[in-house]
Amino acid sequence: MELSRRVFSALAGTTVLGLALGGSVSGGAVPASGASGPVPTGPPPAPPGADGVRHRVAFDRHSLLVDGRRLVLWAGELHPFRLPSPSLWRDVLQKMRAYGFNAVVVPVAWNQHSPAPGRYDFSGVRDLDLFLRTAAETGLYVVLRPGPYIGADVDAGGLPGWLTTAEGDARSTDPAFLRHADEWLTHVDAIAARHQYTRGTGTVLLYRLDAPRRDLLSHLHEKVRADGVDVPLLHGDTPVAWGEAHGTADAAEARRVHLTHLAHGVTLHDAGTVFGGTSWGWLAAPSAPTPTYDPAAALDEARRPTDGIAPLHQTGHLLRHVPDFARLDPAPAVPADDARIQVRHLTNPDTGAHVYVLRNDSAADVTARLPLDGTDVPVTVPAGDARLLTAGLDLGGGRKLAYATVQPMLTLSAGRLDIAVFVGRTGEMAHVVLDCPDEPWPTRLDEEAAWAYDEDRLHVTVPLGAGGLTRVRVRSGGSDRTLLLLFADDAVSLRLWPYETPSGKGLVYGPALLRGAVLDGDTVRLTGDMVDAYGLEVWTPRGITGVTWNGRAVATSVSRARSLRSRRPLPGVTQPSLPSLDGWRRRDENPEADPGHDDSGWTVADRRTSHSTTPVPAEQPVLFADDYGFHYGDVWYRGRLTGAAGLESVSLAYSTGARGMLMAWLDGEPLGTHDAGQGDDGKGTWTGTAGFRVPQRLRERLRDQASEGRPHSPVLSVLVRRTQHDQDDYRRARGLTSVAFRGVSPEVHWRVRGAAAPDPVRGPLNTGGLYGERNGWHLPGYDDGGWESVSFPRADRRQGVTWYRTTFRLDVPPDVDASVGLTLDDDPDRDYRVQVFLNGWNMGEHVNGGPGARRTLVLPNGVLRTRAAANTLALAVLSGGGTPAGPGAVRLTLLGSAAGGVPVTPVASPGRGTP
C-alpha cells in the first residue's frame, strides 16, 4: 500500500509499502527488517535527539522497531516555508511535542531554494539545517519530504518557476528533468545525511519519496541511497482532493478519522497539517489561494490551538504511554446491539489487552450495549463521532483495567505513584472498572467522584467536566503501589502534560502549555505558557521537592494526590496594547500605462515556440510570462501598434491561477479590467478573454492623425495578475496568451516586464512586477517624504495601482508571546485588492469582498518587530476604477497572547539600498 498525504499506511497484517522501509519489497508477508527475532510489547524508545550514538531502525508487520523497541509514529505536517521566522519553528515544534506528537513531516519546497538553474540557497528562512537541528533539540523524529514534487498546495507543487520553460517532463524519467531533479536532491541530501537518526547526528528517521511512476521511483531510490541517505524510505503520491481541508478543526471529526486509522492497525500515522501557516508572497497554489493555509489545522496561523487539537493530544499521548497499541491484531467481532454503531475489535497478543473502536456515522447520538469482559456495558457515541474503549490494560503495580467507558489518555509511574488518565466528552459519566482480588482502599480526592466495590471489582464513576480535574486514589486491592486515577473532559485534558527525564516520568496539570521539564538536584524546572491565571500541580520522579516555572520559584505544598501543588495560581498574561496606524503616505504608480514610458530596457517578446502545454497562437509571438523569465507575481506588457487607425476593439486572452485578473490601457486611456474568477476548487488554471472597446475620443484621435499624414503608433499596456502555477499541469501558460483586434489588424511589437532580480534575503517568490516593487516602495528605508499625506478610509476611483506606507512600533514585554494580525475592514461591495508588505516581506493578498477573503492577515513575529523597534507597512492597492477603492479601516489586531513563548530573533529585512 502506498503512503498518502494524509495517512502513511498500515504496517499491519500482510500489507507493506510499495517501496518498503529500508528497501524495495514486494507485497506479502515480510519478516522483520533487521530484527533479530520477535519483538514483544514493551516501553517505546526514549525521545530522540542528536546523541552521537548510532541507532538501528527496522520494522515488522506491526510497527517500526527502533533499537529493538516498538515505536508508533504519531506525526503531523509542518511546512517551514510557510513560517518565515526561524525562531518560531521552535515554538511550533515544541507545541507539537507537548500535544503528543513524536514526529514531524517536513516537505521541502524546491522553488523556495532555487531561483535559477544551478543556484541553491539554504540560508535565512530557507535554512533546512537549522530546522532539522531544532527538531532534534525538541525531541521529534523527522520524516523528510524533498519531492522533487511535493504538492502541498504550493505553486507548481514546489517545482521551481524556471522549470516551466526547461526541457524535459517533470515527474518522469526524462533525462533533461532528471538532471535538474538529481542536482536538487544532491543539495538536499547533503543536509539530510548530516541529520540521520541512524548515525546519531540528528533525528531524520524516515525519508519519503514522491513519484507517480515506478521507474521514477526507482531512480529516486538509487539517487538518494547514492547520496548517503540510509534511513528507511517511504513512498507516497496520493493527494487529498484539492481544496479539501487537510486537517479538521472539529474534534468529533478528528476523533472519527484518527481512531478509524488506529482501528485498522495503522502504526505510522500522519495526522495531517498540524500548523498550516501563511502562503506568503506568491507561494500559494490555485487549490489554496488565500494567504491563510489550512485553517482547519490543529494550530492556527497565529499558532493557537484549535478545537480539533484535543483528540490529537489525547491520542498522541495514548500511543506514547500505553505500549499495547504498538502491537495489535484483529480480534473476533464484538457487535453492539445497535447497527448504527460500527465496532472494530483488536487485541495485543503479548499483554491480552483489548481495544474497541466504536464509530457512529449517523446524524444522531446513539446509545448501545457492548459486551466488555462478560458485561453488557451501555456506551453512547455522539453523532459523527467515535470512541475508543479498552479492557485488560496494565495500569501499573499489577493492577488491571477490567474495562472503561472512556478512553485512556496515558498511564505512567511517577515516583512511588502509578497514574492513569481517562478522558471523555463534557457532561458524560465516566465508568472505570478495576480488577481487585482483594478489597481496595479508594479515596475521593474531589467530591464529584463515586465508587463501589462488588465481586472483586472496583467501580469508579465521575461526571466529566463538573469540577475540572477529578482525582481518585486507590490503595491496596491486590497491589502494594498506590494508583491515582485522573478524569478529564477535552478542555481539562489540554491542561495535562506528561514529561520524561533521565530519572523518570512525571505529569503537570494547569498551564496552557508545557515546553520543557529539567531536573536540577531536588528541583524540577518547568518552562511553558500561561494564558489565564491557574493553579500548578506537578507529579515528579522520586526526590523532587521544589518547582520553578519559567525560572521563578513556585511555593508548593504536598497534596493528598502526592503532587506538588502551587499555593496560589500562576499569573496569566498581561495583554499588550497595540498602537493605531496613522501617518499614512500615498503615491500612484503604473507609469507603464503612459505611452511615453521608456520600455527600452524591457524584454522583447518575439519568441515563436514554447515548452508550455498551452498552444502558441498561429502568427503570433509567445506572450507567456514564464518564457521570458517572469515566474511570479504581476507582469506588464507593452505592445506598440502600427496601423491602428480604425481600431474598434481589443480582445486579450489570458491565463492565470485562481483569482487572476487583467487591466488594460490604450495610449494611456483606461480600457477596463477583467477578473478570471475563482471557479471550482479542483481547477488549476483559469482562462479568460477580456474584450474592450476603444473609447470614441481615442478612435477619433487615431483617425485624425492618420488622415493628417502623421500616423501615430499607440501603445497597448496590459497588467496581468497571473497568480499561481497549476500543481499538476505546471507548464500551463501564465499571462497573456493571444491578442485579437477588430476594425483593423495592426502590426504589434511586444515588450514584457515582470519581477526584478530575486530578493537575496526574502527569496524568489516575494515580489512580482509592479513598478513599486521593482523600485523598492515596499522596503524599509525607502524615502517616501515626497508622497502625499493621507488618512483612512479612502474612496479613490482610478484604474491601476496606488501605494500607501506608514511605520509603527510595538512594545510587547519580553516574557509575552503576542500574535498580531493586520485587519482590513471595508464595504465588501468595493472592488479592489491589497498586497500587504511588512518590513519588505509580502504577507499576502487581501481581495476585498472576494470569496473566502480573510480580513485579518497574520504578521509573524520575527518579521514583525515586537520589542520597541520600527516596522514598515506598505499596501499596494490594485483597483479597477469601477467602485470607490479603499483601504477602509486598517488596524492591528491582537490574535492571542501568552506569558512564555520562545526567544524570537528578528528576521533579516534589508531596506532600500541595504546590502
How would you label these PLM feature ranges?
Residues 223-231, 235-287:
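Catalytic-core region of carbohydrate-active enzymes that cleave or remodel glycosidic bonds
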Residues 36-101:
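N-terminal carbohydrate-binding accessory modules
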Residues 7-28:
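N-terminal export signals
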Residues 180-233:
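Active-site neighborhood of glycoside hydrolase catalytic domains
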Residues 49, 309-872, 876-915:
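Non-catalytic C-terminal accessory domains or segments of carbohydrate-active enzymes
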Residues 89-99, 105-154, 225:
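Aromatic-lined substrate-binding rim segments of carbohydrate-active enzymes
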Residues 118-123, 148-171, 283-290:
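Aromatic- and acidic-residue-enriched segments that line the glycan-binding/catalytic groove
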